[in-house]
Structure formats: C-alpha cells, structure tokens
Amino acid sequence: MSVPSAPHQRAESKNRVPRPGQKNRKLPKLRLHWPGATYGGALLLLLISYGLELGSVHCYEKMYSQTEKQRYDGWYNNLAHPDWGSVDSHLVRKAPPSYSDGVYAMAGANRPSTRRLSRLFMRGKDGLGSKFNRTALLAFFGQLVANEIVMASESGCPIEMHRIEIEKCDEMYDRECRGDKYIPFHRAAYDRDTGQSPNAPREQINQMTAWIDGSFIYSTSEAWLNAMRSFHNGTLLTEKDGKLPVRNTMRVPLFNNPVPSVMKMLSPERLFLLGDPRTNQNPAILSFAILFLRWHNTLAQRIKRVHPDWSDEDIYQRARHTVIASLQNVIVYEYLPAFLGTSLPPYEGYKQDIHPGIGHIFQAAAFRFGHTMIPPGIYRRDGQCNFKETPMGYPAVRLCSTWWDSSGFFADTSVEEVLMGLASQISEREDPVLCSDVRDKLFGPMEFTRRDLGALNIMRGRDNGLPDYNTARESYGLKRHKTWTDINPPLFETQPELLDMLKEAYDNKLDDVDVYVGGMLESYGQPGEFFTAVIKEQFQRLRDADRFWFENERNGIFTPEEIAELRKITLWDIIVNSTDVKEEEIQKDVFMWRTGDPCPQPMQLNATELEPCTYLEGYDYFSGSELMFIYVCVFLGFVPILCAGAGYCVVKLQNSKRRRLKIRQEALRAPQHKGSVDKMLAREWLHANHKRLVTVKFGPEAAIYTVDRKGEKLRTFSLKHIDVVSVEESATNHIKKKPYILLRVPSDHDLVLELESYGARRKFVKKLEDFLLLHKKEMTLMEVNRDIMLARAETRERRQKRLEYFFREAYALTFGLRPGERRRRSDASSDGEVMTVMRTSLSKAEFAAALGMKPNDMFVRKMFNIVDKDQDGRISFQEFLETVVLFSRGKTDDKLRIIFDMCDNDRNGVIDKGELSEMMRSLVEIARTTSLGDDQVTELIDGMFQDVGLEHKNHLTYQDFKLMMKEYKGDFVAIGLDCKGAKQNFLDTSTNVARMTSFNIEPMQDKPRHWLLAKWDAYITFLEENRQNIFYLFLFYVVTIVLFVERFIHYSFMAEHTDLRHIMGVGIAITRGSAASLSFCYSLLLLTMSRNLITKLKEFPIQQYIPLDSHIQFHKIAACTALFFSVLHTVGHIVNFYHVSTQSHENLRCLTREVHFASDYKPDITFWLFQTVTGTTGVMLFIIMCIIFVFAHPTIRKKAYNFFWNMHTLYIGLYLLSLIHGLARLTGPPRFWMFFLGPGIVYTLDKIVSLRTKYMALDVIDTDLLPSDVIKIKFYRPPNLKYLSGQWVRLSCTAFRPHEMHSFTLTSAPHENFLSCHIKAQGPWTWKLRNYFDPCNYNPEDQPKIRIEGPFGGGNQDWYKFEVAVMVGGGIGVTPYASILNDLVFGTSTNRYSGVACKKVYFLWICPSHKHFEWFIDVLRDVEKKDVTNVLEIHIFITQFFHKFDLRTTMLYICENHFQRLSKTSIFTGLKAVNHFGRPDMSSFLKFVQKKHSYVSKIGVFSCGPRPLTKSVMSACDEVNKTRKLPYFIHHFENFG
C-alpha cells in the first residue's frame, strides 16, 4: 500500500524521473568482495546496488515509482500536522514554563551566577577516563546527533544579550581582580508571535528539522543542497581525489565564527561545503560530516555501476534514502544504547498522533550531558597503531586550539587518522565535571574569545524558561527529591563538601535548583534517572512519529527484507566501506573500547600535557574606523561652511560685476577727460590702530582720489581752488619703520599715507610733483619726525570728533544740558578744549555735509553766506552759535530777515522777481525734480505777488516780503536749521511732534485705562489680527511634533526589544522621529510653492479661512523646521552609525534583513555612509540641503538672485534622493512617499499648468526706455490668460539666457489687451535687457520673444473687495499699483458692474524723491485724468529731508502751497496729489481714515515695498486696532527689494 502524498509532495512526484525498465534484464552472477566487508555490510550493498532484485523486478519498479520524496525542511512528515518537526518549529514543553515574569524574562532571577555554579560543580581534574570505556568517538558522535535534530541555541533576532557575572579574581577571566568582567550570553531565537502575554509565553524555535532525516548531511534547504551536489551520477561534490568535500567557494552561509587564536574573521571560502552550518566547528564533528558525505558517494557509485542507465536524480534519491536509514539505525539502535546503557522499546510502527518536537529540557539540559565526556584533545593514529604527534611534539591535537579552524587541520591529517584515533581514545569520565577546553576555553565572539560551556548550559535552561529540577522530574513522571542527598547519595557520601556547596549556592532551596545542575549531579557513569528518561522519551517520540522512519513498512520506501538488512548496519560498516580503514584496524563496536580491541591509547589525555591555548582578551570592532569617522564628521561639518564660503564668494562676484557695470555706466555718462590717470598703491593711516589698503589715483582732473580694492571712491582730494599743497614726510632716521607722507590743503582734513619703502615714497613724491605741475599747482615739502607728524595729523576721524564736539558745545550753550547729561570734558583740560572749540571753523563742504546737501547747491551757498558774517570762507564757532540761537530762540521777524537776505543776492535791500525765481529754482533743485518749467516759475511768482496785492510791483521790500509770508507765520515759529553733525537736533523736541499734514484730526479724549486692561486689549487684538496664522502655525507644529513623538515612542517603548533599539539606543528613536517630521515638512513645502493653486484659491471663499498671502512666510517657517529636523536626523545618524560600527557581525545580521554581510566582512563607517543606498543618499541629501539653505539666505537672494534660483532648483534632486533614501530599509520601511505623494501630485499638476504659458513665445509689441534706467516692455497677451491687477509673472527673454527667469509685477491692467512690465536696470540681467532694447543696439529683424510663467497671486490682489482701501507704496514697491490704480479707475469710472467694491481709495506714495520714478508719475497723471468719480485720493511723501520744520522744507512747503492754489497741481510732479515732506505718521492717518469712514466694518490696508515700510504699516494697524473700535484694519503686504 502506498501512502498518500501531501499536496506539496504530489507536485514533486509528478516530476519524478521514472525508474528505467528492468523486465528482460537477468541478474549477473557477481560476488562482491570489499575489504573489511561483513555479511551485513555486503548484503546491504548488494541489496542497494541491485535494487533487491531477488524476486520480481516488477515488484520493485512498482514500489520505487510510488516512493514519496522526503522534503528537506521537515514539512509534511505528518500529513495531519504538516509543520510538526519542520524547520523553525517550536520546541515543545512537557514541564510548564517558569519565566520570571511569566512571559519571557529569563528564569532563575534569584539564582546564583551560572559561572559560579560552573566553578563549584563542574570544575575538576582532566584525564579521568570513562567508567565504561566509552570512546571519544561516542562523545563527538553525540554532537552529530544533536546537530542532526536540533539547533536552538543560536541567537535570534532581535539580539538579546545578558551578562553572566564573573566573580572577582576569577582564575580564568579576571586575573587582574578588576571585578567588572562578565561573559556575554545571547538568548536563543524564538517565535515572535509568542512572549506577548502569560497565555502565550515565549517559545524558542528549532532551526533544524526534528526528524532524523539526514539534515546534518543534506541540509534543510534544497538550494543549499544543490550547491553541494555534482548532478552527476547522484554524487555530492568532492575534491579530485574524492576524499574531501569542496571548499565553500560559493559562499554558502556556513557558520564562520572567529578563530579564538587569531582574533579576526577568516574567509568562509576556506571552510568545507557540507550540509550543516556547524560542521567546521572542530575536527571530530568535521570528520563525521566528511564520513557521511563519502558514505553517500560510495552508495551512489555502487548503484551507478549496477544501474548505468539510471538518472542522476534516481541514483541520488536512492542513495539518500539509504544513508538516512543507516543514520537512523546507528543513532537509535547503536549510539543510544551505548550512551544510555539501555535501549528503546521495540518499534511498534508509525504513530501519527505523537508530536516529534524537540523538548526544552532535552535541548537545554538532558542531552547536554554528553559534554562531560568531551576530552581536551584528539588522538590521531594510523592502521599500525602509530599515534601521531603535533608539529610541536605534543601527543594529541588540543581541542581549544582548533575551534573553527578545522579546515586547515586536514592539510596533513586524514579523516581515517582522526576516526581511528577517536575509536582508540577513551572519553572523559561521565560525571558533573567538564574538561577545561569546554568549561573555560570554549570559543566565543571576538570581544570575549573564551567562554564557559557549563555556565552557558545553565543559562540556556534559564533562557528557555525551564522550571526547577524537582518540577522537571515530576513532569516526566519521576518522584520529587525531598532532601539534598536524594539527588545522588553515593556522590554526596564520597564528596560531602559538594553537598554543602550546593546548599549554600541555592540558599538551601531544593526547589530552586537548575535542571542542568540537578541532572548532572544525579548522573555518574552514565546519565542519571532523570536525564535518561528525558532522552529516551525524546528519541522514542522521534522514531514513532516519523512517517519516513526506515522501519515503517507503510511508507513504501523499503521492503521488510531491506529493513532487516538495514538493521544490521553499524557505524563500523560505514567507516570501513567509506574510508581506507581496514576491518582489522578498528574495533567493531566503535563506541566502546574493550580489552583486545586494536590500538589502545597511550594514556588518558590531560590538558596539562597538551599545547597551551591562547587567550586573547577584548576586541574593539570600531578599530580601523576612527580616522574615517573623524574625517566624516569634519567633512559634514565643513559642508555648510564651504557652502557659506561659496555663497560669500558669489555675493562678492555679483557685487564686483555690479561695480564694473556701474563704472561702465558712469564712464558712458561722464564727460570724457583727456590725459592719463596715474595710480599708486599705499596704506591710508586713519589712526594708531587702523590702516586700510588704498589706491591713490592722480587725476585726470585736478583732484587726487583714494579708491578701495573694490574700485569704490573713498575720498576726493580736490585741488581746484588751491594753489599750494603742503606735503610732510617722515624723517629717515627710522630705518626699520615704514615711511609716511602727509598731504595737507586748506579747508579739508589731512591725508596720511604709509608707503612700503623709502623708494616707493620717493616715487610717490615724484608722481605728485609732476601731477601738481601739470595742473599748475605748487608743492611745499618738509621733513618731520614721524611721531610728531602722526600726532599732529588731522585725519577724518579726528576732524569728525572735533566737529561733534563743536556741535555739542553749540547745543549745550544754546539749550543747556538735558536732565542727567554730563559735560564730556574734564576740568583739568577744560581750558584747552574750549580753546580748541573756539578755534574750530567749518568749511563750506563741512557745512553742506551737516545739512545733508551738496556744497554747490544754491541753497547752501546762500545759507553759508548768511552765516559767514566776516566773509572769510569759513564759519567760526561764534558765527555758528549765533545762527543756532537765532533759529531756536529768535523771533519770527529775525527768521524772515534771514530768508529775505538769502533771496537778496545783490544786497540792495529788495528782492526782484529774478532773484525770487532763482531761489525757487534752487528749492526745486533740492527736491530733485525737473517738472517745473520757466513759464510755471514765472506764473507762480506772479501769483504770489497777486495774492498779497503787489501785482503792480516788480520787486519786494522787506515789509512786502513780511506781508507775503503773513499767512505762514505759524509755520515760521518752528523753523529750525537741522544739522547732521551733532547727535542731537538743534530744535526743541516738543516742536518735532507736530506734523504738517492735510489730515484734520481732532484730538480724541480717550478714558485712561488700567495698564493691565491695555495689555489685555493688545493681546486680544494680536490674536484677532493673526488668528488664522496662529491657528495654522499651531496646527502645523502640532502635526510635526505628534509625528515626531509617535515615532519616538514607537522605537523607544513599542520596539525596545528590536536590534535597532538595542544597538542605537535612543538615537534610533530620535532619528526616526525626526525623519517623520522632516518628511512632513519637506512635503508641505511643495504646497506652499504651488503658486497657481494658491492664486486660484484666492478667487474662492476659502481664501477667507486660509492665510494664502502668508504662503511665503509659511514656506520659510516650514523650511527652517525641516532644517532643524534634518540636522537632528543627521547628527543622530552619525551617532547611530558609530554605534553600528562598534557591533559584531552577529549583531549586524539582525540589524536589518535587507543587507547580507559576508561572514568575513566587517562593515565600517565608510560602508554605512558611502556604500549603502541610505548612507550615500543621506550624504548627498545633506550636501544639497546645505547648498539650498545657504543660498536661500536673504543676502544671497538679494545680491545673487540667479545663483539662489539655480541652487533652489536642486529641490528636484532633494525629493528624488529622499524617495530613494529609504529603499534600502536599513532602519525600517520607507515612509517618505506617504507624505510626499499627495503634495507631489498637486505640485506636479501645478507645474504642468505653468507650462501652459512658460513655453509660449510672446511677441514684443513695444519697448520704451524711460528715465532712471527703467524700460517698459509691452508684449502680446496670450488668449484666455486671466489675471488680477497686482499679480506678477516670471519672465525671460529668448534673446539671451532664455532659461533664466526673473519675477516682475504686471503693470498693465486686466482690461487691457496687452501685458506690460516696467523693469529698472539694476543687476546684470536687467541691464542686458535694457541694453538689448536700446534703440542704438536693437535690430528689429531679430524679433526676440518673451516667455512668462504665471501669473501668480500677490499680496495686493484683493484690494477690490473692500469699500475703503488704503494703499501704501514705497520704493520699487509702487510697481503693482501701476496696474491696480488703472484697474480701479477703469472699474469705478467706466463699468458699474465690474465687481470693484471700492468707494474710496487712499494711495500713499513714499519716496526719497521723484527723480527715479518719472514713469510712475506719468501713470498717476493718467489715472487722475480717468478718475471721474474721485474715488482715488493720492498723497505723496518726499522723505529726503531730515525734518518737517527744517528751513528748506518750510520754504518748499510755502512754494508748493502757492503753486497748488494757482494751478491745482504740484510744483514737483504736476499732479493733483498732495505733496508732504517727510515720512507719514501712519497711526494718525489711519485714525483719520477710521473716523471718516466709521460706517464700514473693515478697511483693507495694502502695503508694498521694503520690509521696514511694511513693518511700520503693520505696527500702525496694530496700534489703531488696539483701541477696539470699528472699522477694523486688515493688513495685506508684499515685500520688494
């Protein structure tokens, strides 16, 4: 009867090669005679070779064709329970688990150290032979048996390392008596689904099959086996002579533990390729592995000779079945009786309900009894009883010298010599004592190369949660011991001290004794009652539960006759038939040595007579990585520094380009001078501690210039009005000191230069003399002592200090000292300082500088002439003091007299119209505008005469002038002379509070509020104004922190048992948490830059709930947050990689399942950083991140925008590398894609929308070069392009750098059928654009095109939604309003259904002067014409003056007021707009608007310009809103420049 196959096996059966037909074949009459063959062995091989063709050939064919192939991994042995006995199945428990916590913590928490127990009960003398003359071959064959059925001591993942305490001054491990040593112990692999609760305590797994199925020979993996097979004649691979297996050149994952005596990982290719990964551990177990490989090949060769037509697979399978059967027979019926001294009950057949699993007590305690028989060395001999010595002359090979180095052992030794030596060698005594080679010198990891097997055995029982010794006995049906002597009465009778030590060690707790200790102590001569019961029970279950057991006739593998013959096979038959050992050279019962057996051992081996074992303590896995780790840290630290240096160089490069451009532009504008310019390098001496390198330029005009290294002028030394130049040179008595030269001219501070040498000074003097002669000037040269010259030199700094003191004294004498202010001179030096001040006088240039004007301005000349009463060309201290007193305390008539005298050029006592016209022109010149023509000046003067009834006169007397200025009498009260020289104003500060404004604001009598309520109002107002920003910022950081905390908690507490957590500590929690947060932040950045989406959302009501205008600020906040977490992630991983680099190969095996390391390869820091996907991309990401963030610095963005933008395009690489970064799964599955997917799709779609116009080449309709280097470009508007006024585009020109795009605001209105931009030439690109379209250079045939990307939403585009709006533009920030104001007047004046809600709009233009914005004045002029509904009110603030009530400003105001009355337009701009001088008081203005438009609930305030401007407007809105009155001001802003 055939046994039904399992589903997997049926699939295999279909592919089985059918047995070749044998119907007509007759048996050859052969007699097989092999050396040493016995009746059983000969008959066995006869049966195998001929296929049992003793009867019917057909019978055999039928049987073999239906024979089921046994799987290698142990599955489907039991068809009802396919996983029983399979690889990675649980160890089984017969006794209840006894974990300390009931779940997984090691048992015996209160028991003594296992090393101490080992020293107490397992230490003894070597060299005591077996009581029953068991051979060493039996002792090592026991290891084969163990390897065949169990592998449950190997550490699993995660690594769990425990420390076995070592007593101080331990003779082996703590010879220095340090007391801090420990033996590392790794817990065994277990099922990850167990150990979670008391209902499912931890269960260790068996990584071998539990069956005796030849897995020691054939492995548990078919892939592994295929590497061993030759696929020729059914044999396994061997070397050419067929005696040894091949080396592991294919790098099958054999165990390649470090050799203790070498302290390094050797190549796995030196090992023999065999079925069990542990076979290279020692020479004895390796010999058995080679023996059975030969046994398989011997059978295969015999089968092939008899059946030459059989396939390789048929031969292999038949040989495998026979090898497994012979192994089963040897283990159960030969080894076990010899080991236990008793046999198993007779076989009763297959019992499918019996579980074959390896028991915990069997694996962790009972079957480890065989360790006591292991000798300290291995004898080798030949067939003539010649025992072979080692090369050093020792009688045997020391076991502890061959751990994991057995492959080289067979270079001068044969398997036969080892097997015959083991058969003659008597094992160690069967007692609790272990020989020193396994008790003190067992192999270990490189950091602890020698371990204690006895201690490890006890720890393994605790690891498996074994109960105490008595409970374990009871679970196997044995009686509990009630007294200590019950354990082993004969032993304790002969060794009573052992009993005392046992009681003391376990605190006299008999029910707390470890299973292994109790079992070993009860054994003597052979396993004790308990261990015998455990071992017999285990092997009986293995035999009876095995469906493929060779005695099971129902499996169809062997016939009863074959089974009977197989039962006769012994290990002696296998050795004699597989090796060159002859039958008389080895005893028949190889497990026992009896008198008369061949070749008795010379003596019982003792460790003292063998080669000493080396003991190398400690190993640093980080060795070799120290320098590289330092280099990596330094490199990563220098990356941002290098990026910053590159950014600095880029800024300097762009500044240099701008300077060269500026110089070229100035050269084109300036008149051409004839003559050459001579130069010389020198150092300008400023004071004792400061010098600067300068280039002195002579000419070409009559002036000497000092220029810095950037080419910028530092000082001009004018010689126009000077005839004689005084030159002093330092005396030549200081040879070692560098020479100095001093240039002194009247009305200017001195120029002191340090030259490199006296020769250089002579050269300088010669050049200066020639230059002065060329311009017809004289030079006086005198030699002065160097120190005296430097002490007397009046440098700029000294002159400045003197002038400050000059102005301060004038202020103090006029107004007195302020409260708390002290005079800054001492009494001792007061007289000298007073004299110094009295002697100081101001030149016209210094006076002009104090007024903030140029010396050639007419106003300066006139004012200087008024103050300089003695007309000596300088203003003395007394003259200046009188003027200050007059302006600060003088009467209005006195001030008017000064103005009258300024206008009276010819000093005839009257002002004619010509003189008044000249003054008007000087005032207009101050305002830096050219909008006032001759006719307008004449018209203005006639109007002023007419206003006071003097139209019949052509001149004004002083009385007439007073009459004309009568209405401005109040303004003249506060007239002062504002000077920059002093650090205080020369006006009473109370007068400065007033503002000249057209806004009539009545003072509001607010009730005084308690300061606490005022603070509360301010706080509430702040929250109300920024509620959306605060909410989304709060939401953003809550999500970011939650993501960090979630991952941190997961890796800190939920995954604390994993290897990542064990190795990296809290570092992995920090890095994984920061990875989650930075993934979120970087992904969110894409949404903030989805400009088309943001622009579109502004058209929907949702924009009321999302602060879309703040997307740039939020982009920066999210980026800075991402930067923080990126740096944290990087630093964390640097620490993590350090920890990883300090780990052993075994620990790294569990670190990740994604990376496999060769057993002889130790990855260092360079591997993790530069040879893994995660490390390499991480370094690249760090570099890209540094580049992007450094080049995003505001300074670089402003000075080198092109570099900023080009570096910012690296974000594509940032996101690609971030996606790749986690694919290696070193620390976990990649998660970046989860955050990136949504924003990435949105951003990609947004970019696709931008492509709609980006690659559309638009025709240039018209270009216009405007003053102040502005160009207006009008170009084609694409069809279906919709935009709002105030929006902006990114623009490029196909004529040059077509891929370089720059952002510009659209100045065309949405209703116009074209697009336009006003671009001021500032940088290289804008200058190229202007020069390209310059009519002098432009070729109309070139027909360049414009490409745009956008339009995108600006902060000002929602202006039309407010009934009342205030618009504030400053500097270049007026550009959006060119479009907005046009759109406003179009919407309110021509189309009542335009959707513009504005009923009143205030536009405030703040600029230093109108000079650079003539084009915008034209725009405003056009807007004023179109504004028929007067919805727009324009105010212009000119900020170039210091003070509202400065003398100049007052006169300008008077003229402006007259001109406004006369022509209804401004004298400066020609606009109806009101002009103001100075900066606006935004708070007062907003209060005025609030009061005037109290009927609305909210007013929109829109500001655009430099950051200080928008911040001041924001502050004003905050201040007004704090009053908690309606209307409420909502501020929208956009920063330019």
Swiss-Prot record:
Entry-linked InterPro entries: DUOX_peroxidase, EF-hand-dom_pair, EF_Hand_1_Ca_BS, EF_hand_dom, FAD-bd_8, FAD-bd_FR_type, Fe3_Rdtase_TM_dom, Fe_red_NAD-bd_6
Main location: membrane
Glycosylation-annotated residues: 133, 233, 577, 606
Gene Ontology biological process terms from the UniProt entry: adult chitin-based cuticle development; adult chitin-containing cuticle pigmentation; cuticle development; cytokine-mediated signaling pathway; defense response; defense response to bacterium; hydrogen peroxide catabolic process; imaginal disc-derived wing morphogenesis
Enzyme class: oxidoreductase
Originating organism: Drosophila melanogaster
Domain FAD-binding FR-type: 1253-1358
Domain EF-hand, residue spans: 855-890, 891-926, 936-971
Superkingdom of source: Eukaryota
Renumbered residue ranges of the record's region Disordered: 1-29
Keyword NADP recorded: yes
Full protein name: Dual oxidase
